[in-house]
Design a protein with these regions (language model features):
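A short beta-loop-alpha structural element at the N-terminal edge
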Residues: 1-15
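Hydrophobic adenine-recognition pocket in adenosine-nucleotide-binding enzymes
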Residues: 5, 86, 119
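Helix-loop element at the rim of GNAT/NAT acetyltransferase active sites that forms part
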Residues: 15-32, 45
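Acetyl-CoA-dependent GNAT
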Residues: 30-89, 100-101, 160-161
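Conserved active-site tyrosine of GNAT-family acetyltransferases
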Residues: 59, 130, 135, 157
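Conserved catalytic-core motifs of GNAT/GCN5-like acyltransferases
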Residues: 66-69, 74, 116-119, 136-153
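Conserved acetyl-CoA-binding loop-helix of GNAT-fold acetyltransferases
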Residues: 92-105, 127-132
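Conserved GNAT acetyl-CoA-binding A-motif
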Residues: 107-119
C-alpha cells in the first residue's frame, strides 16, 4: 500500500534510509537521518505543496519517496527531483514503481513538467529501475559525489510529466 507520509512515519522512514542508504553508494549522504530531521522534512514538503510517500507491507514502512524542486529559483518551478528507497525485501514487488507513480502524479497535479532523478553511477539497478519507470538518461557527471573514500559519478535521468 502506498500513502502520503505523515510525521508519525518519521522514525520508520529515517530508519529505512539509514539501513538502505548509509552503507551503500545509492546516495552520497554520509550522515544518519534522525527522526526529528525526517519529521521536519515531511512537514516542510507538505507546506510547500510537495509530498513524501511511504510504501507499507504488513503495517511496516518498506519504501520511501519524496520530491522537491530540482534547484532553487522561480525558473525551476516546474522541474522536480525525487528520491526513492526500498528495503531489499520490497524490491521487485511493484512498490517502487507505485512510489514513483505517486510522486509523479502529485508533482504533475502541482504543475510540474519534469521529474528528475540523480542516480549514482555505480547503481546499475537504480538506473535500470528508473528506465523501466519511464526515465531517460540525460547526462553523466563525472565525480561530483564522494563516499567511502572515492569520487562517484552522478547520472541525471528525466521523466516528462506533460
Amino acid at each position: 500500500m502506498i500513502r502520503e507520509a505523515s510525521p508519525a512515519d518519521a522514525a520508520e522512514a529515517a530508519a529505512l534510509l539509514n539501513e538502505v542508504v548509509l552503507p551503500t553508494t545509492i546516495s552520497f549522504r554520509h550522515e544518519e537521518w534522525s527522526a526529528a530531521e525526517m519529521d521536519a522534512r515531511i512537514r516542510r514538503l507538505a507546506v510547500t505543496g510537495r509530498a513524501t510517500f511511504v510504501a507499507l507491507r504488513d503495517g511496516r514502512v518498506v519504501g520511501f519517496a519524496s520530491y522537491d524542486q530540482f534547484r532553487g529559483g522561480s525558473g525551476y518551478a516546474t522541474a522536480m527531483e525525487h528520491s526513492v528507497a526500498l528495503r531489499p525485501e520490497a524490491r521487485g514487488t511493484g512498490l517502487g514503481r507505485a512510489l514513483i507513480d505517486a510522486v509523479a502524479a502529485h508533482a504533475a497535479k502541482g504543475g510540474a513538467r519534469t521529474l528528475w532523478a540523480g542516480v549514482s553511477g555505480e547503481n546499475e539497478a537504480g538506473r535500470a529501475f528508473h528506465a523501466r519507470c519511464g526515465f531517460e538518461e540525460i547526462a553523466r557527471l563525472p565525480g561530483p559525489g564522494f563516499k567511502f573514500g572515492r569520487p562517484l559519478d552522478l547520472v541525471l535521468m528525466r521523466r516528462a510529466l506533460v
